[in-house]
Amino acid sequence: MAKGQTNAIIGGGEGIPTSVCTNIVVKAGNGQATLTWTDPPASETVHGVDIVWKSTSVRYKANSAPTSATDGTLAVTEMTRNQYSSNALTITGLTNGTTYYISVYPKSESGAVNADATQIVSVKPSDYSTWTVNIDQSNSNPLSCCTYADSATGMTKGSSDWDDIFGYKPCIMKDGVVQGYLNPNDFTKYENGSSAPITDTTYDVMIEFPRRGLSITTSGNIITVKLTNDPDNSNFQYYAHKRGSTQKDYFYLGAYDATGSSSKLGSNSGKTPLTNVSITNFINYAHNRGTGYEIMGFYQWTYVQALYVLKYGNLNSQSAVGMGYVGGSSAQSTGATNSSGMCYGSTSTTSRVKLFGLEDLWGNVYQFICGLYSDSSRNLLTTTDNFGVSTSSSSWEFSVSSGVSSDSGGYMTKAQGTNNGGFVLKVANGSSTTYFSDYACLNASRFPAVGGYWRDGDAAGVFYCFVNYSASDAYSYVGSRLMFL
């Protein structure tokens, strides 16, 4: 019997079925599943007998596979060959949380059915979704290189619908406890309209990011970024929402560049960003705020970058959102965008930018981030806990090769594109209007600062990551951002 044939057949004629259906792909949805497959050839010869494809039936069953082409529930009998090879069949009326087994049965003109077990797939519908953006790094156009897939298919780039999916919210925090949520269009007020203490250094203005799963993978030139609202999916990582072995429902980032002093790092409106402080001391000053406080971490920064590229589908963040304060001469006070909504920007180089409630995510001052170190071989050492400035690999949770053999910098054309490497530089050969459109560098034995500062012009943006600082470097143009995890 030829490969792909089976004794599990029904029907008359010569009793020889077609070959199997291939490329069977099933995807779960909310109370439904979608299925694509490739039918057997229209005609084929097996043992000297001409076999002609007639139809393909799809049957499904809860908790166990259909045992024959008459068992289970009939979803469809396809009479047009390859009708569902690219346009998926949708099976509705399924129960979320129940595993369904779906069998595909091709039938020949003689009536023989191929019931080979390789044509069985399983799926568990749920009310969780997966949103995907594919980044083609061989396409220099920062907008057209990003295409949507899965639940993102058909969504509009830049739409506010994405904000509902991400679920982030501005809030007032004190000692690690949310005191209340802010009006997203006016940070000076709580949701109920009462005044919020955004200038009071006893409190901090933070942005709350609820738990979502993230996956960043690369195949060839394609970086695939996936986000799910499933809080526990083994196909995703939750590094931004964990501290060591402890899983977190939320992480919080300062709405502003970090303010305060050596007594306590803060996040308040109407203040001058704290600068001229080393990454070592910034981490210490955050710790002085209390248990759970840090400066923004690498995995949280990566998470925000992923949300950006999902929402805007454009690698040029200064074009998609705004230039940011990149044409000035000194650091500007916080709170300029309090009444500018959650995402704001303009073409002016002396205006401010705001992404997901985070003012000056690029421009104004650089932000040191913790949780990432490039060692002497440019391996990327990362962690979700015990943030510090140790240069010993044993002090870090993960170590991955960057693939970068010498110190490198320039406009980024290729990123690491992995769960542990995020969007750190891999190849720099672009410009301010092509590929990732931001400047980046990766040097040995260095810590990172991100975003860009007041004189960076079109080099700044959400993918600006400058891994070029020692543990003791301190400059007037480098600050940080508070985090609670």
What is each residue range found by the language model?
Residues 1-25, 474, 481-485:
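Enriched but not universal
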Residues 10-52, 96, 112-127:
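Pro/Thr/Ser/Gly-rich low-complexity, intrinsically disordered linker/stalk tracts
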Residues 33, 127-208, 214-216, 293:
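GGW-centered surface loops in extracellular recognition modules
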Residues 40-73:
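Solvent-exposed loop/turn segments flanking beta-strands in beta-repeat/beta-sandwich domains
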Residues 84-90:
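Short S/T/G- and acidic-enriched coil/turn segments that sit immediately N-terminal to beta-strands
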Residues 91-114:
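Beta-strand-rich modules
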Residues 131-133, 299-302, 323-338, 344-345, ...:
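C-terminal, surface-exposed recognition/capping segments
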Residues 196, 200-203, 230-361:
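Short aromatic-cysteine micro-motif
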